Amino acid sequence: MDKLRITGGARLHGEVVISGAKNSALPILCASLLTADPVRLSNVPQLNDTRTMLRLLGQMGVKAESAQTSVNLQADQVHSLEAPYELVKTMRASILVLGPLLARFGEARVSLPGGCTIGQRPVDQHIKGLEALGAQITMEHGFVVARAKRLKGASVRTDMVTVTGTENLLMAATLAEGQTILENAAREPEVIDLAELLIKMGARIQGHGTDRIVIDGVERLHGADHTVISDRIEAGTFLCAVGATGGDITLRNTDAAIMGATLDKLTEAGLHIESGPGWIRGVMNGRPKPVGIRTHEYPGFATDMQAQLMALNTIADGTAIVVENIFENRFMHVQELCRLGADIDIDGHTAVVRGVARLSGATVMATDLRASASLVIAGLAAEGDTLIDRIYHLDRGYDRMEIKLRNLGARIERVTGKEDE
């Protein structure tokens, strides 16, 4: 099993190209199921999750041709309407095939999802919404089994804001009969990106980017070309890294406009930020200031950035309060950060982070995707060597992270098998 070995203390300098957004690419790949025509995508990140999604689509009969960050898809010979457990268990985003399959083919069988073990993350809102559109849904042998002759437009209000739920219902509604109104919809940039692709495919959608999306169903969708937006979480992670190590880095292929809350908090921490079309520069000198955060749905502070900013707070000059409002059980990185010398107490959904003058390297274990990133940031700032185990979590959502960091001057390497012994 691969690990990362980091020798901390190196300041980061240089430029890094940010990859396409994982949380945009996954639903967009699934949207190819909505048409028999070719869908041509660019800026698709090279991640374990995108590779898993392409394997899943391939098992269904979708033809896919990949060349670096470009993917051409065509779902004109779909022969399976099932997403099996062996693929779904590693990636909860597999549930995103449910809406497109049901809308176009009238049937879908999707195993209950896996992915990061962060709380319950239920799919009940997906089911509730699809049932409102006329689907008959049962649970059979661990599968969500959905059937509908043709979905019919309806007003759907989810009990909570759910990004994947909004995306599933948005895709399903594009081919439904009549008008669908999604209330309490997610406003994330990745939802907007999906909607923009669907509009290129012939969907009639208004209000994406607000909490009320209106979809007028059409008979069929056609092919399209689309460029996936840049990954705001990867961008934020690299800015947290330079905040922890000090230095001067410039991010390319990124968009400051979709990173408001993250940039605000990093500025508060003492990172000097400049930005322009397609780039963000982060300069850090001295010790970071403590920054309190409360996670919220977009445009609030993203739960996917909570662990990384906590890593920055561990070496801040003071105490910070971190409140996790989105997912339960999303402080699994705290125990590992404490192994590096962090001073953190947890009380329910709140963590109290008392900054220390320095962290010291140790062997730690990644528990989920963003926790992995927080340990990388802490390891970069720590004195001595840090060895991070279970980095397959990191590979799910970061495109060649250690190579990008090494190009910025970090002392980081991937070790395989028994190299670390």
UniProtKB/Swiss-Prot annotation:
According to its record, what are the GO cellular component terms? cytoplasm
Q: Which reaction does it catalyse?
A: phosphoenolpyruvate + UDP-N-acetyl-alpha-D-glucosamine = UDP-N-acetyl-3-O-(1-carboxyvinyl)-alpha-D-glucosamine + phosphate
Q: Gene3D superfamilies this protein is in?
A: Enolpyruvate transferase domain (3.65.10.10)
Keyword list (alphabetical) reads: Cell cycle, Cell division, Cell shape, Cell wall biogenesis/degradation, Cytoplasm, Peptidoglycan synthesis, Pyruvate, Transferase
Class of the enzyme per the UniProt entry, highest EC level: transferase
GO: which molecular function terms? UDP-N-acetylglucosamine 1-carboxyvinyltransferase activity
| Localization, UniProt | Cytoplasm
User: 2-(S-cysteinyl)pyruvic acid O-phosphothioketal occurs at which residues?
Assistant: C116
SUPFAM superfamilies per the record?
A: EPT/RTPC-like (SSF55205)
Stated EC number for the protein is 2.5.1.7
Biological pathway:
Cell wall biogenesis; peptidoglycan biosynthesis
Q: Which residues bind UDP-N-acetyl-alpha-D-glucosamine?
A: R92, R121, P122, V123, D124, Q125, D304, I326
Pfam families for the chain? EPSP_synthase
> Does the record carry Transmembrane helix as a key word?
no
Q: What is this protein called?
A: UDP-N-acetylglucosamine 1-carboxyvinyltransferase
User: Gene name?
Assistant: murA
